[in-house]
Amino acid sequence: MTSYVDASALLKRYVDETDSDVAEALLATDAELVTGRHTVVEVRRNLARMLSGTALAESRAAFATDLSSFSIIELDGATCELAATIAEQTGARSLDALHLGAARRLGTALAFITFDHRQAYIARTLGFRVAGA
């Protein structure tokens, strides 16, 4: 099975937060892991906001290593147009709409892993099976 992973789920691998253990278990499956290109910006921005020094450097390195095992959905025109339509129809925040648009490019027969409750609600209304939130 394929799992689309958003930034909220990935961050829990590098920052000890509520449900970090749940996120780790979801990401440790044999599923093909997929994310959008913009996840790089979102995760690195949040790592820099939450960590510093050696912890930041180690987390960034671990993220880069982990990301190399993901399939990446590029934010091309079709993905952005789909995300814009989702945002218009659901009121999703911009980055959430990009995640949902990227995942929708793969169809709805995948797990959508997020710990963002607003995004999870919208993902469910779009027909995704949500894990995490």
What residues fall within each predicted segment?
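Short active-site oxyanion
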Residues: 1, 30-33, 68-71, 107-111
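Short, well-structured N-terminal submotif of metal-dependent ribonuclease cores
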Residues: 1-35, 39, 50-61, 128
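Histidine- and aromatic-rich ligand-binding microenvironments
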Residues: 5-6, 35, 92-93, 115-116, ...
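Residues that scaffold the ATP/ADP-binding catalytic core of kinase and kinase-like folds
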Residues: 13-14, 46, 122-123
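Active-site-proximal, substrate-binding regions of enzyme catalytic domains
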Residues: 41-73, 78-84
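Active-site neighborhoods of divalent-metal-dependent phosphate/nucleic-acid chemistry enzymes
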Residues: 71-121, 128
